[in-house]
Amino acid sequence: DSRVKLIATATIGFDHIDTAWCAAHGIEVTTAAGCNARGVLQWVGAALVHLSRTQGWQPAERTLGIVGVGHVGSLVKAYAEGWGFRVVCCDPPREERERCGFRTLEEVAREADILTFHTPLDASTRHMADSRLFGLMKPGAILINSSRGEVVDGEALLRSGLGWALDVWEHEPHLDPALLENALLATPHIAGYSEQGKANATAMSVASLARRFGLPLEGWYPPQAAPARRRPISWQELCRTIGGAYDIASESRSLKERPGDFESMRDHYAYRREYF
């Protein structure tokens, strides 16, 4: 029997933990799910602004498909609707539980001009975006992935004729050179790297310890990080301000020029400050 009673990971995922073994040995596992949702939202916002500028469209002219409507996807949905996109969503587990009118993956793929993935990685989502799905999408549609690299079949994406903007990659840190070179945007798995996201993850892990072991630390938050001011932001304001908060195009150029620095870029990242 293990002396370990709790594993509190300060990450949103748990694919690095053998949860079945832990459950069989009475070890509780908690994650920091949702800790960096606003950081990812702002990465997606920066990507959309960049794409609209370089391709010459406005949100009202585009349908945004969202796959996975959890912590991140629900935020992207709310803000994207406010920015003027037509939004269609797919989340089979939530649809089964809640009957909330979400669409099938195939329907969303057919309708979307831009398809963004916000799913965990498990057996049902591995290579969810494959050649069959790409064949349903509009010519010239764009795929965005900031969830897990293995959600997308990279080899099939290369053959798809679609555009893509990727923060996560199969076989990280070893990136497919063609996938990287041809990406509209390419970043080194840092979509959620915000000051507040890091602080939230730490606070959530401490809260798990406090609850499990009766420690007087409920409500603790890292004193050096101010929680984000959550507020609506218009498309016009986003276009004016996002470049000052996060230069996604510059970061993309850096990764394309120095793909071998993938891990170093992550390890020495200057965490962004959330501002909406």
PLM features per residue range, with description:
Residues 140, 146-276:
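Rossmann-like dinucleotide-binding domain for NAD(H)/NADP(H)
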Residues 81-99:
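NAD(P)-binding Rossmann-fold cofactor-contacting core
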Residues 33, 41, 58-81:
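Glycine-rich adenosine-cofactor-binding loop
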Residues 41-57, 82-85, 202-211:
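Oxidoreductase and adenylate-handling cofactor-binding alpha/beta cores
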Residues 94-178:
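Rossmann-like adenosine-cofactor binding region
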Residues 1-56:
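Phosphate/diphosphate ligand-binding glycine-rich loop within oxidoreductases
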Residues 2-5, 25-28, 85, 138-141, ...:
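A short helix->loop->beta-strand "cap" motif at the edges of active sites that frequently abuts
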